[in-house]
């Protein structure tokens, strides 16, 4: 309370700004963005090695799960020292993917990753949701405990999340009737679009993220991350 009182007295003692000629949309001076040079990802994965997920069995067919094939390509790329994982143009159905250190998952123009609508396609593990550490389904794309990893390209990650929102609103109606409004946020497990957790030097750039079933992009316990 002493700190708060001191802060109030200090703020009240400050001279008032002259706002005689103030106009909305204008600021008296340009903000200092020099701090931005010291944040964000400091390095990108090496692009000299290219691994095609199609060569591991990924199929441009929105009715066939390509999760395992894409993950095998990511793992192989990581084991070889890192590089870029690519996909031929088309629509790919996938569950949870885990991008590893030194790997760039490239979602190129003409490529659409379509998220599986079955929640069982997303393994559960301990994470943090709305301030509480708890077990929760993986995101569609996950970067967990990694360094120098990225997702890039001009393609699309379509999370098709309506099924999870329908579930949430139905449960919320039931919970509100019982006076349990806030609990539904934790009881109704949904799939995030992208999760970056306990990682460093991560870059997410240029692709389109749409129709997520829960949060679009969560950056948790991580540093030097760029979302562009």
Annotate each PLM feature:
Residues 1-5:
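Sec-dependent signal peptide recognition
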Residues 7, 11-104, 108-198, 205, ...:
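Extracellular "leader-to-stem" segments immediately downstream of a signal peptide or signal-anchor
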């Amino acid at each position: 309370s002493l700190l708060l009182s001191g802060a109030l007295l200090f703020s009240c003692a400050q001279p008032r700004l002259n706002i005689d000629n103030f106009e909305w949309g204008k600021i008296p001076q340009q903000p200092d963005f020099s701090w931005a040079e010291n944040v964000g990802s400091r390095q990108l994965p090496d692009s000299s090695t290219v691994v095609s997920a199609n060569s591991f069995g990924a199929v441009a067919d929105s009715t066939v799960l390509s999760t395992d094939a894409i993950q095998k390509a990511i793992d192989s790329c990581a084991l070889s020292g890192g590089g870029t994982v690519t996909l031929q143009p088309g629509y790919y159905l996938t569950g949870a993917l885990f991008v590893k250190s030194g790997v760039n998952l490239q979602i190129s123009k003409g490529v659409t990753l379509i998220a599986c609508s079955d929640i069982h396609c997303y393994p559960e593990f301990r994470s943090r949701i709305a301030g509480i550490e708890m077990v929760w389904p993986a995101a569609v794309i996950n970067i967990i405990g990694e360094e120098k990893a990225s997702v890039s390209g001009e393609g699309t990650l379509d999370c098709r999340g309506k099924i999870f929102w329908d579930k949430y609103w139905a449960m919320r109606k039931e919970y509100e009737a019982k006076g349990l409004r806030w609990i539904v946020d934790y009881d109704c497990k949904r799939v995030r679009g992208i999760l970056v957790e306990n990682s460093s030097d991560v870059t997410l750039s240029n692709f389109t993220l749409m129709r997520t079933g829960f949060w679009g992009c969560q950056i948790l316990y991580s540093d030097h991350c760029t979302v562009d």
